[in-house]
């Protein structure tokens, strides 16, 4: 019983950090234009996210891995710093 409580407490304390945002390529260009909510959700899940939705003509993904490249806002810099 003590072991079970220890495991549950450990899981709650460790947590899992995830990113939310607009996925971008190496040039900083937004990857997924928004077609439908279902399209965004499927593509965000393909990128190992928990899901996605349409937001300002771009897909906004939720629950992406920490190493995913994202922008917080849907401004498309595309190669500009």
From Swiss-Prot:
Q: Which residues form a coiled coil?
A: none
- Tell me the residues on which Cysteine amide occurs: 78
Q: Which GO terms describe its molecular function?
A: sodium channel inhibitor activity; toxin activity
Annotated signal sequence range: 1-18
Question: Disulfide pairs?
Answer: 29-78, 34-54, 40-59, 44-61
Name the SUPFAM superfamilies for this protein.
Answer: Scorpion toxin-like
Q: Does the keyword Plastid apply?
A: no
Start and end of every LCN-type CS-alpha/beta domain? 19-78
Q: Which GO terms describe its cellular component?
A: extracellular region
| Protein location | Secreted
Q: Keywords for this entry? A: Amidation, Disulfide bond, Ion channel impairing toxin, Neurotoxin, Secreted, Signal, Toxin, Voltage-gated sodium channel impairing toxin
Q: What is the annotated tissue distribution of the protein whose record heads this document? A: Expressed by the venom gland.
The record comments on the domains as follows: Has the structural arrangement of an alpha-helix connected to antiparallel beta-sheets by disulfide bonds (CS-alpha/beta).
| The family this protein is said to belong to | Belongs to the long (4 C-C) scorpion toxin superfamily. Sodium channel inhibitor family. Beta subfamily.
Outline what the protein does: Beta toxins bind voltage-independently at site-4 of sodium channels (Nav) and shift the voltage of activation toward more negative potentials thereby affecting sodium channel activation and promoting spontaneous and repetitive firing.
The protein's name: Beta-toxin Ct13
Instruction: State the organism of origin.
Output: Centruroides tecomanus (Scorpion)
């Amino acid at each position: 019983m003590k072991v079970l409580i220890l495991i549950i407490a450990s899981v709650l304390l460790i947590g899992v950090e995830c990113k939310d945002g607009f996925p971008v390529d190496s040039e900083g260009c937004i990857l997924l234009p928004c077609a439908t909510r279902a399209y965004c959700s499927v593509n965000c899940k393909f990128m190992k996210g928990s899901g996605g939705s349409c937001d300002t003509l771009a897909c906004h993904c939720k629950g992406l891995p920490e190493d995913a490249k994202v922008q917080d806002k849907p401004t498309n810099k595309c190669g500009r710093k």
